[in-house]
Every structure is written in C-alpha cells, then in structure tokens.
Amino acid sequence: MKILIVDDESSQRNLLKGFLAKQGYDVLTAANGEEAFSIFSSAPVQLVILDHRMHGMTGDEVLKRLKALNPMVHAFIITAYGNVSTAVTSLKLGADEFLEKPIDLSVLLDKIQHIEQQIVIEEEVTSVNDALQTSTLPLKIVAHSPGMKRVLSIASKMARSSWNVFIQGETGTGKELLAHLIHMLSSRNDSVFIEVNCAAIPENLFESELFGHEKGAFTGAMSKRRGHFELAHGGTLFLDEITEIPLALQPKLLRVLQEKRFSRIGGEKQLDVDIRLIAATNRNLKKMVEDGKFRQDLYYRIKVLELEIPPLRQRREDIPELIRLFLDRYSTQPIRFSLEALDALVKYPYPGNVRELEHIVQRAITFARGQLIDLLDLPEEIRHHQATTQGTLAENLEAIEKEMLLDALEKSNWVQTRAAAYLGISERVLRYKMRKYDLKNTS
C-alpha cells in the first residue's frame, strides 16, 4: 500500500516514514499542501496521513482538495491540539481517523492494517460488480452494506478455488444468486451450471434425479436417463436445500464426492464425474448433524468453504437500492415511493428477505393509483409494523439516540474517543449513554 505523509515538521515525517517503511509500506512525504497535491496527482496513493495544523494550508483544507481529486482515498488526521470540534470537522470531511500526538505507533499500525482490509474488500467488490456488468445474471447484486461487501469479497476468493462451497442463509436472501456468481467468477464459467431444488424432489425419485437410471431399472423406467451429476460434468452443481436429501441416500452422495465416480440406478458401469459442488440451506445444518438427521462425514465434505448471507434486516443500507432495481425491472412507467412509504419499507424486518421485498414492490406497482406509491398503498403488515414501532415521542427519541450511538461506535471500530468526537460529545457522556442502552462490542 502506498502511503503519503503530509507534515511540516521534518522530524515527524521522518519518524513515521522510517517506522512504516520497516513494516513494508511504500511511503512518500510532503512538507505542505502544494507538495502533497503534486505527489498525489502522479502516484496511486491509497492512504494520506495529514498533520492538522501546518503552515499555509491546514490539514482539513488539504483533505478537502484530495477528496475532490479522489473520493476513495483514505485519510488520517494527526494533531497536537485535539478537541471535539476539530475532530468532528475532520471526520465530516471524510477522515477515517483523528489521532493525537504523540502517536502510539502500534495503534497507528493497527488502524492502517484495518484500512488495508477495507481496501481489499472494496477492490474485490468493484471487481465483482465489473464482472456482473457483462454477465447474464437476472439481477445486479446490491452490496452497499458492510455485511454484503464482505459476502462479495469472500465469494470472489471462493470462486478462485476448486473446493466445495456451502452457503447458509434464510429463505429469500439470495443463495441461488450467490451460487451463480461463484460459478461465473470461477474457472468453470464456460461450462454448465446445474441447479437442483432438493425441496421439490419426491423422496422416492431423489436417487434417479441425482444419478440417473438405466432403461428398465425400475417400473416406469422406459428409457435411460442421465442425472444431475452427469449433466453437470465439467461444471458446477448447485444443490439448493441440501438438507432435504434423504438420510439413506447421503452415503452414496458422500461416496461420489470422495471418489468422483458413480453408477446410474440399474447400471454396472462406473462413470467418472468432475463437478464443483455448491450446497445451500436455510436450516441449521450443524443442529441437524447433532440430531442425527444429517451425516457428519457428509457435513464436513460439503462444508470446506462456508459463506453466510445476512438477512435483509441486517443490511438495511441496501434496501433503497433494491427498491430502485425492482422499480426499474417491473414498472413500465416512471413511479416512486413517498418518503413515508420508503421509511416504512426500510424499517420493516422482512421475514421473507429480498424475495419478500421484491413481491412487495411488484404488488405496489400493480395497484399504484398514480406515479407516487404512498404508505396506504403498502401491505397491512408493513403499515401495522410502522404504527407499532412509532411509540411515544420519548420512545422515538431514545430509539433514534441509540441508533446514532451504535452507528458512530460501529463506524469508529468501537474506539470511544473517535465515536465521541464523531457525535460531538465527551467520552464521559458517551460511556454513560452506552451503559444506559447496554451497548457492547460483541464482535
């Protein structure tokens, strides 16, 4: 990572440059804003460490101009004259951190490493989105929330391997879409993607569906039939709701995954098969293993790489963009939701996740009385949830305050000094309110 240090004190520049260079970073230095702009315009700088109070342009002024040149650049502001108001100003301008001198180098290194991880995730998300632009996937994957950005980053890494993948997620979270994405980004993307909904297969037909049968293998087998494993040869096989596979058939599935060979029902010939398995479920697979409803050895065979998709209620930042996508997809005329309706949609918990949101938008478009969809046009359960969550004025204010505190703490990595500065309150007040609302870092 390329880091630019901007400080008018040569001793501070040299100290930071020497320390960071020893950690393996590519470090550039500037004594003032003009030097910083010259370097920034010619070098791919990813992090700028700025002194807040310098001769000429201040750190805030330099930061504002650098952000105008590249909004994606990360920045730390350092100062010997720290106070809440200056910290708030810098953070609002886009600084990631506000650090006081003398700088604790170990803390600085931790924060830089955290930024590195963020940059890697952002680059992988950008790469995935670029790939989706040229894909035939039916829906763009919305990932503004940190949770979904992590999902796309992990999926991108998984795609580069050949191991089996297990996707966990509630109904309607997009497990099928993620399976398609992993296949699309993999080396098998020019081969087939076979999707099997295990929940839709009658128990007595599972073996035939998965492995095929020979003519005359059983009553009604009038001709030879190739199963999904055979059809997926060379590509990816996606077994959705894999927990529905009968316990009696699981040993054969395990054997095929281990030996990469199988025979059709009624056949003697062993057929070689080369597939990448992606399995998914909305159930607690570990609990099923403990209850004896799913084989433990098969559990470990399919769970080499695991990916969990967060429910929509944990990625509310994505809801407005998802709504726009569904409006563009299903509406034949310009139409939008009122602010009140949009607020209700963002707050609703969505037990059916993205699929439920999609159906809500489809219904709203169908019954729209004009170009504006209002709260009264939404389903009763959403209006009821909005009404029951409004509460008294005091309850509303407390809910808003708690949400603001939690947002500031999460944005500041639970560093209380930075969170307090972001909110414009003292650390003592922040600690009091954290106790009041029982806010704790559980990660």
Kindly label every feature range from the protein language model.
Residues 13, 55-56, 83, 245:
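The feature encodes the CheY-like receiver
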Residues 129-272, 277-283, 288, 328-367:
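AAA+ ATPase active-site-proximal loops
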Residues 43-49:
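Active-site beta3 strand of CheY-like receiver
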